[in-house]
């Protein structure tokens, strides 16, 4: 995914780079979108979440169906919020948001959300703000999110990491490592990387943090 214009390209590593064909433009996400910051896959589909253009609120969930070769997109899955985290499991897509949209416009929402999307019906099942014990501020930006080896959905809220049971939506563990300052990018997700050594590496608060 590229900025500007939220364009999605595919690259064949077995072929030489050709600026006209490899990478190949696959889709241009429309409806005033600019930054495709999160991608995941599942059920033979690619899911892309975006941040809108300057002066605009409301991101897009774009979906490519490999079986049909067709794209679809859905604006404002969470009203007036950008999608900055995606994770797939068992026919459901989990997304997380930032209250901020494009530059030059203040957010309308007060709390970031997690949403659950039914992949088979292309319908949102629910949205909610997780109750995170001990967090120092109301979440305004949640992401990245990722399923861990324990089956929980893990996520980051600025300086806090948490793990949520995807069935009950209960946050079963959390830890505030740094204060929530929100003094860097308001949409770029904090990374979560599950390593072969059993460690979880993150960039919460824009710092490299290793968690055992």
Annotate the PLM regions:
Residues 3-4, 13, 51-53, 98-101, ...:
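Short loop/turn segments immediately following the C-termini of beta-strands
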Residues 15-32, 71-81, 122-139, 175-185:
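Surface-exposed loop and turn segments in beta-propeller and other repeat-based domains
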Residues 48-58, 96-112:
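Short, conserved, GDST-rich strand-edge loop motifs in beta-rich repeat architectures
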């Amino acid at each position: 995914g590229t900025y500007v214009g939220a364009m999605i390209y595919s690259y064949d590593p077995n072929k030489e780079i050709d600026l006209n064909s490899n990478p190949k433009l696959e889709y241009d996400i429309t409806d005033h979108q600019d930054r495709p910051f999160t991608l995941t896959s599942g059920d033979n589909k690619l899911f892309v979440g975006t941040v809108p253009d300057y002066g605009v609120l409301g991101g897009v969930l774009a979906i490519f169906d490999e079986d049909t070769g067709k794209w679809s997109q859905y604006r404002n899955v969470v009203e007036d919020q950008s999608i900055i985290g995606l994770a797939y499991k068992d026919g459901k897509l989990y997304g997380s948001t930032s209250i901020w949209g494009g530059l030059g416009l203040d957010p309308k929402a007060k709390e970031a959300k997690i949403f659950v999307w039914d992949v088979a019906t292309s319908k949102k099942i629910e949205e909610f703000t997780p109750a995170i014990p001990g967090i120092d501020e109301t979440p305004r930006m949640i992401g990245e999110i990722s399923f861990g080896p324990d089956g929980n959905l893990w996520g980051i809220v600025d300086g806090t990491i948490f793990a949520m049971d995807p069935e009950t939506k209960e946050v079963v563990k959390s830890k505030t490592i740094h204060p929530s300052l929100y003094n860097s990018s308001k949409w770029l997700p904090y990374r979560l990387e599950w390593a072969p050594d059993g460690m979880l590496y993150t960039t919460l608060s824009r710092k490299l943090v290793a968690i055992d």
